[in-house]
UniProtKB/Swiss-Prot annotation:
InterPro entries: NADH-Q_OxRdtase_suN/2 (IPR010096), ND/Mrp_TM (IPR001750), Ndh2_N (IPR045693). Keywords: Chloroplast, Membrane, NAD, NADP, Plastid, Plastoquinone, Quinone, Thylakoid, Translocase, Transmembrane, Transmembrane helix, Transport. GO terms for cellular component: chloroplast thylakoid membrane. NDH shuttles electrons from NAD(P)H:plastoquinone, via FMN and iron-sulfur (Fe-S) centers, to quinones in the photosynthetic chain and possibly in a chloroplast respiratory chain. The immediate electron acceptor for the enzyme in this species is believed to be plastoquinone. Couples the redox reaction to proton translocation, and thus conserves the redox energy in a proton gradient. It is found in: Plastid, Chloroplast thylakoid membrane. Belongs to the complex I subunit 2 family. This is NAD(P)H-quinone oxidoreductase subunit 2 A, chloroplastic. NDH is composed of at least 16 different subunits, 5 of which are encoded in the nucleus. GO terms for biological process: ATP synthesis coupled electron transport; photosynthesis, light reaction. The chain crosses the membrane at residues 13-33, 39-59, 81-101, 107-127, 131-151, 166-186, 211-231, 243-263, 277-297, 305-325, 336-356, 378-398, 411-433, 468-488. The gene is ndhB1. Its main location: plastid. One of its GO terms (molecular function) is NADH dehydrogenase (ubiquinone) activity. It catalyses: a plastoquinone + NADH + (n+1) H(+)(in) = a plastoquinol + NAD(+) + n H(+)(out); a plastoquinone + NADPH + (n+1) H(+)(in) = a plastoquinol + NADP(+) + n H(+)(out).
Length: 494
């Protein structure tokens, strides 16, 4: 009874996560008692739980920062906004997956369980305040992502992607845990983040070699989750081999959660070593922007191209992490991350829809698509232009604000490189856009010739199209309504 009262006292702060846990239990029960394999009730339960969690989180928005469950979780505006981002990702990815699951005739229950579990792990990771909870939440997110990548068991490419993802993910987690063990030992046996800092000061180990080594290990572990160069090797293969809706999910969810973790870990644990980890992050960001954009130019697979594009995009976002000491550093990172979620998911919704109708992922096979499906063409064009940063779309204003904050923070070497590589990215985005409106060798490809779409092509009829339109609108309107978004982001603190 005492434990139950304690849960009621502290549980309010993690009520959104509790709703997701309840939905997981209900989903399993419905699957056990239902004779129908893919009952619509499963979608209803999952989407209702996610919407309820979003509403609860919005009601908790202005509450005072609090540490709950013996300082295991820390709830504040910074953590809440990243928890909200993860819920938005899941809320968009489930409708995006409905038609895919129906067409491929794969099991729905497992898919929803993995999505909800990964969402739960990501949300806990955003507010975890000790090393053990961080690792458990990270593995909850990671293991669910591994299982999702191998969701289509009979697909050889999916199995290969899962194996690569699992092996490299396990290696990065091992490195991260070793970094945690060094912090635990150097601080005199502390696991809570702020107590680790106090312990390091007490043991006079704060500027020791062991502390620097632990920082390197943490950077490697987090770099894998963020797909930063040179820890990106898994990304193209996993993106290409995994089911497209699954790629859409962990291309944003894992990055949101890992970004929240990296920002909190480095700013809380290494405040006096900021020069060192800022320099290391700058090197990784520059490598990611240059390598990601140059290799993306050579790709012929749409998913591999988006994989390298995502590597370069996270390089841009790192500018906001490094510039966090300025007044607008966090705000620029948060603003661009929100815009990136919609741009990226909108693009993946487009290629999911095209893949279901044609069965191909080759960029050349998109030639002449505008003659058959103007809605899909327009949506893909707007999302790609927004990713490239073309005004007046939201991607332009997000990048402009991000680069301006970086310049204001004194990143005079990093920002010009970001601007230059952003121009390079426009080449492969515009190359695809040109292809959509032209015919290959003056004739349509066999895939476009056999492309079937109803006469009411401009009216959305499927859940993928509805998700696609929501993402396209959200990738466009914030360019006009950017000031309120920035104002909300500027009120976000640890």
């Amino acid at each position: 009874m005492k434990d139950f009262n304690l849960f009621l006292l502290y549980g309010n702060s993690i009520l959104p996560e509790c709703i997701l846990i309840l939905s997981l239990i209900v989903t399993i029960i419905i699957d056990l008692i239902s004779d129908e394999k893919n009952t619509p009730w499963l979608y209803l339960v999952s989407l209702t739980a996610l919407v309820t969690s979003v509403v609860i989180l919005l009601f908790q928005w202005k509450e005072e920062p609090v540490s709950t469950f013996f300082e295991t979780f820390q709830i504040n505006s910074f953590n809440n906004i990243f928890r909200l981002f993860i819920l938005i990702c899941s809320l968009l990815c489930i409708p995006l997956s409905i038609d895919y699951i129906q067409c491929t005739k794969t099991a729905l229950t497992e898919f929803l369980l993995f999505i909800l579990t990964a969402t739960l792990g990501g949300m806990f990771l955003c507010c975890a305040n000790d090393l053990v909870t961080i690792f458990v939440a990270l593995e909850c997110l990671g293991l669910s992502s591994y299982l999702l990548s191998g969701y289509t068991k009979k697909d050889v490419r999916s199995n290969e992607a899962t194996m690569k993802y699992l092996l490299m993910g396990g290696a990065s987690s091992s490195i991260l845990v070793y970094g945690f063990s060094l912090l635990y030992g150097l601080s005199g046996g502390e696991i809570q983040l702020q107590r680790i800092v106090n312990g390091l000061l007490t043991t006079q180990m704060y500027n020791s070699t062991g502390m620097f080594i632990s920082m390197i290990f943490l950077l490697v572990g987090v770099g894998f989750k963020l797909s930063l160069v040179p820890f990106h090797q898994w990304t193209p293969d996993v993106y290409e081999g995994s089911p497209t809706p699954v790629v859409a999910f962990f291309s944003v969810t894992s990055k949101v959660a890992a970004l929240a973790l990296a920002t909190r870990l480095f700013n809380i644990l290494f405040p006096s070593s900021s020069t060192e980890w800022h320099l290391l992050l700058e090197i990784l960001a520059i490598s990611s922007m240059i390598l990601g954009n140059f290799i993306a130019v050579t790709q012929i697979s749409m998913k591999r191209m988006l994989a390298y594009s995502s590597i370069s995009q996270i390089g841009y976002i790192i500018i906001g992490v490094i510039a966090a000491e300025s007044n607008n550093g966090y705000a620029s990172m948060i603003t661009y991350m929100l815009i990136y979620i919609f741009m990226n998911l909108g693009t993946f919704a487009c290629i999911t829809l095209f893949g279901l109708r044609t069965g191909t992922d080759n960029i050349r096979d998109y030639a002449g698509l505008s003659t058959k499906d103007p809605l899909l063409t327009l949506s893909l064009v707007l999302c790609l232009l927004s990713l490239g940063g073309i005004p007046p779309l939201s991607g332009f204003f997000g990048k402009l604000y991000l680069f301006w904050c970086g310049w204001k923070a004194g990143l005079y070497f990093l920002v010009p490189i970001a601007l230059s590589t952003s121009v390079i990215s426009m080449y492969y985005y515009l190359k695809i856009i040109k292809l959509l409106f032209t015919k290959q060798n003056r004739q349509l490809t066999i895939y476009i010739q056999n492309y079937k779409v109803s006469s009411y092509a401009l009216i959305p009829k499927s859940s993928i199209e509805i998700t696609m339109i929501i993402c396209v609108v959200a990738s466009t309107l914030p360019g006009i309504l950017i000031n309120p978004i920035i104002a909300i982001a500027q009120n976000t603190f640890f």
